[in-house]
C-alpha cells in the first residue's frame, strides 16, 4: 500500500478563465477560430498571461503565430468579439463572475496580418475602453457576462486602409489585492483588412510587449473589494484615439489609391472551413484506385490540427469520406458524389446585443456614430500607465520593473501537460481515447478532468502541478490550482496505469438531494465551508449528478491505496 497524502484548503469558485474565440463583422459570424490568433494548447488556452513581463501581452500565448485568414471590414464597421470559458462552446459561459475588471480594444497597422512575429512592439492605439460604470455599478466584465460573452466596438472612420491586428484585453482584478498582487490579463487578437484609402489616418501608437505592464501601474493592484470603491478607477495605458471629425470625414472620402486585400483570403475551392483549415473537393475519379485516393488524407489533417475552438466540422468531412467509401464499396467508381457542394454549416449570429457598452470611451464617439457610449463619458483618459510609450523612432519603451516576474502564478508556471490527455474536444473521431497515466514515476502528473456525462465524455480541462509520490515526502508543489469546475463531479488523478477519482461535496452548502444517487454513508458533522474528498477507483465510482462550484486554492486529501489495484478505494 502506498500512502497518498496531499497538503491542500479550499474556497468557493473563482475559477473560470476565458478566451476570445470568434469575430463577427457587422453581425456576420466569421467562424470559430477564423482570423483569430490564439493559444494553440487547448489545456491552457483560457489561462491568463503570466508573468506580466511577457511579449504574450500583445496577442496572447502563440499570438506571434499568424492565422491563415484575414477578415475584411469596412470603415466604421462594428466588430463583435465572443469570449468563452470553454473555447469549443461545449458548455456555456464566458468568464466567471468573480473576475471583475476593465476591458479595452486596440488596433495596430501591419504590412501583412498573415505574417508571423508582428504583434509585440510599437504601433498599438486604443479604440475603446470601459472600466467601472458608476451609472450601472458594473465592471466591463460584468456587462460582458450579462451580454452572453459578446463585446462590440466600432472602427473609427478615416483610418488608412490595409491590414490590422485588433487586440482585445480583459483584466480580472479578483486577486489584484493579494500579496503578491495577481492581476490577470486575458488578451487575444483578430486579423482584419480595413477597406479604405491608403492615405487615411495612421494614429500614433504605443508599445505593447514584455515592458508594458508592471505592478507599478495603480490600476493593476486595485482592490475591487473595498467598500465603497475608490473611484474613479485609475485607468492605465494610452488615451483612446479620437480622430478629428472633419479630417476623418475628408480622409474617408479620399478618392486616391484604395487598399486592396491580397493576403488572408479564403482559398479558392474551399468547401469546408474549420478555423485555419480548409477542406477541398477531391479530384474527379472514374476507377477504383481514384475512388479511395484523397478524402481520408484531408480528414486526418482536419482531426490532427484543430484549434481549441474544436473539431466539430471534422465530423462533417468524415461523413463525406464515409459516403465516398460507401459508393466505392458498391462499385460506383465515378465521382465524387455531390461534387463541389459547400459543406460549411450556416453560422449563428451574435448571441447578444451588438451595441457598444455604455459608460466607456470609444474612438467612434467624436463622429456621432451612435455607438451607445454615454455622452458624459467621452473625455479621453488622462491617467496613463508609465510603462506605455509612444512609438516615434526616437523613443523607446520604458522597461517594466524586474519584480514583475514575481507575479507569476504557479497555476501556469507549475502546470504540466499530460501527453496522453490530448483529446480535449470529446467529439467524434473513432479511436481517440482518453488520457491515462505515464507509468510508474517518482513524480506523477495531476490532470483535472471535467465530466458531465457520467464518465462517458471525460474532458481534460487543465493539467496542473506535480506531486512527489516519494514514501517520505508527499506534497503539492503548486500553491494555486484553479480547475474549471462548473457542473463537474470531481477530480481525476492519473497515476501509473490507474485512474483514481476524488469526489468532493461541500457540507451544508450543496444539499444532498441535489446528488442522485446520494453517496453511501452520512456526511461528517463539520463546518459550513468544509469540503470532504473521497478517493475512488474508476470501477468503484457510481455516477451521480452533484453540481459543485469550487475554487481549490489548497485542500487536503489523505487516502491509502495500492497503486496497482484500481479496484480499491
From Swiss-Prot:
Residues listed as glycosylation sites in the UniProt record: 112, 244, 381, 472
Cellular location(s): Secreted
Region Disordered, residue ranges: 399-439
Principal location class: secreted
Disulfide bond in keyword set: yes
Catalysed reactions listed for this entry: [(1->4)-beta-D-glucosyl]n+m + reduced acceptor + O2 = 4-dehydro-beta-D-glucosyl-[(1->4)-beta-D-glucosyl]n-1 + [(1->4)-beta-D-glucosyl]m + acceptor + H2O
Biotechnology: Lignocellulose is the most abundant polymeric composite on Earth and is a recalcitrant but promising renewable substrate for industrial biotechnology applications. Together with cellobiose dehydrogenases (CDHs) an enzymatic system capable of oxidative cellulose cleavage is formed, which increases the efficiency of cellulases and put LPMOs at focus of biofuel research.
Sequence positions that bind O2: 174, 184
Keyword DNA damage found: no
PANTHER family found in the cross-reference section: ENDO-BETA-1,4-GLUCANASE D (PTHR33353:SF32), PUTATIVE (AFU_ORTHOLOGUE AFUA_1G12560)-RELATED (PTHR33353)
Family the entry assigns: Belongs to the polysaccharide monooxygenase AA9 family.
Name of this chain's protein: AA9 family lytic polysaccharide monooxygenase A
Amino acid at each position: 500500500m502506498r500512502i497518498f497524502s496531499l497538503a491542500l484548503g479550499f474556497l468557493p469558485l473563482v475559477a473560470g478563465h476565458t478566451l476570445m474565440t470568434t469575430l463577427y463583422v457587422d453581425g456576420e459570424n466569421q467562424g470559430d477560430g477564423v482570423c483569430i490568433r490564439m493559444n494553440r494548447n487547448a489545456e491552457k488556452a483560457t489561462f491568463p498571461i503570466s508573468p506580466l513581463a511577457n511579449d504574450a501581452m500583445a496577442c496572447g500565448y502563440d499570438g506571434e503565430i499568424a492565422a491563415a485568414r484575414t477578415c475584411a471590414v469596412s470603415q466604421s464597421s462594428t466588430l463583435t468579439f465572443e469570449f468563452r470559458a470553454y473555447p469549443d462552446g461545449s458548455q456555456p459561459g464566458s468568464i466567471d463572475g468573480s473576475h471583475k475588471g476593465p476591458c479595452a480594444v486596440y488596433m495596430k497597422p501591419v504590412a501583412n496580418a498573415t505574417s508571423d512575429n508582428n504583434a509585440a512592439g510599437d504601433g498599438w492605439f486604443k479604440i475603446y475602453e470601459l472600466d467601472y460604470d458608476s451609472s450601472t455599478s458594473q465592471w466591463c466584465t460584468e456587462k460582458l457576462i450579462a451580454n452572453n460573452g459578446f463585446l462590440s466596438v466600432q472602427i473609427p472612420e478615416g483610418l488608412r486602409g490595409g491590414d490590422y491586428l485588433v487586440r482585445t484585453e480583459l483584466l480580472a482584478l479578483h486577486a489584484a489585492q493579494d500579496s503578491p498582487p495577481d492581476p490577470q490579463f486575458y488578451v487575444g487578437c483578430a486579423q482584419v483588412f480595413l477597406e479604405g484609402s491608403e492615405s487615411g489616418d495612421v494614429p500614433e501608437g504605443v508599445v505593447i510587449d514584455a515592458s508594458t505592464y508592471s505592478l507599478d501601474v495603480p490600476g493593476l493592484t486595485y482592490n475591487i473589494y473595498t467598500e465603497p470603491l475608490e473611484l474613479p478607477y485609475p485607468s492605465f495605458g494610452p488615451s483612446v484615439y479620437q480622430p478629428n471629425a472633419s479630417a476623418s470625414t475628408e480622409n474617408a472620402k479620399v478618392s486616391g489609391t484604395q487598399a486592396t486585400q491580397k493576403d488572408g483570403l479564403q482559398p479558392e475551392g474551399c468547401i469546408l472551413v474549420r478555423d485555419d483549415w480548409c477542406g477541398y473537393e477531391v479530384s474527379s475519379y472514374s476507377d477504383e484506385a481514384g475512388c479511395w485516393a484523397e478524402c481520408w488524407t484531408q480528414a486526418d489533417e482536419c482531426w490532427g490540427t484543430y484549434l481549441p475552438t474544436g473539431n466539430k466540422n471534422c465530423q462533417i468531412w468524415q461523413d463525406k469520406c464515409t459516403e465516398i467509401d460507401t459508393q466505392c464499396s458498391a462499385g460506383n467508381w465515378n465521382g465524387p458524389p455531390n461534387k463541389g457542394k459547400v459543406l460549411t454549416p450556416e453560422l449563428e449570429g451574435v448571441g447578444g446585443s451588438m451595441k457598444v457598452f455604455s459608460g466607456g470611451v470609444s474612438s467612434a464617439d467624436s463622429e456621432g456614430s451612435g455607438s451607445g457610449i454615454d455622452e458624459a463619458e467621452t473625455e479621453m483618459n488622462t491617467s496613463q500607465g508609465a510603462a506605455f510609450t509612444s512609438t516615434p523612432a526616437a523613443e523607446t519603451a520604458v522597461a517594466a520593473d524586474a519584480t514583475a516576474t514575481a507575479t507569476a502564478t504557479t497555476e501556469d508556471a507549475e502546470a504540466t501537460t499530460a501527453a496522453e490527455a490530448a483529446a480535449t474536444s470529446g467529439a467524434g473521431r473513432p479511436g481517440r481515447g482518453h488520457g491515462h497515466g505515464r507509468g510508474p514515476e517518482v513524480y506523477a502528473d495531476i490532470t483535472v478532468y471535467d465530466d458531465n456525462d457520467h464518465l462517458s465524455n471525460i474532458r481534460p480541462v487543465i493539467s496542473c502541478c506535480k506531486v512527489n509520490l516519494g514514501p517520505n515526502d508527499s506534497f503539492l508543489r503548486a500553491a494555486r490550482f484553479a480547475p474549471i469546475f462548473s457542473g463537474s463531479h470531481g477530480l481525476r488523478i492519473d497515476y501509473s496505469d490507474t485512474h483514481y477519482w476524488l469526489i468532493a461535496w461541500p457540507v451544508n452548502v450543496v444539499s444532498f438531494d441535489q446528488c442522485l444517487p446520494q453517496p453511501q454513508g452520512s456526511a461528517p458533522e463539520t463546518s459550513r465551508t468544509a469540503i470532504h474528498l473521497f478517493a475512488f477507483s474508476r470501477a468503484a465510482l457510481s455516477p451521480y449528478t452533484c453540481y459543485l462550484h469550487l475554487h481549490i486554492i489548497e485542500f487536503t486529501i489523505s487516502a491509502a491505496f495500492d497503486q496497482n489495484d484500481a479496484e480499491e478505494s
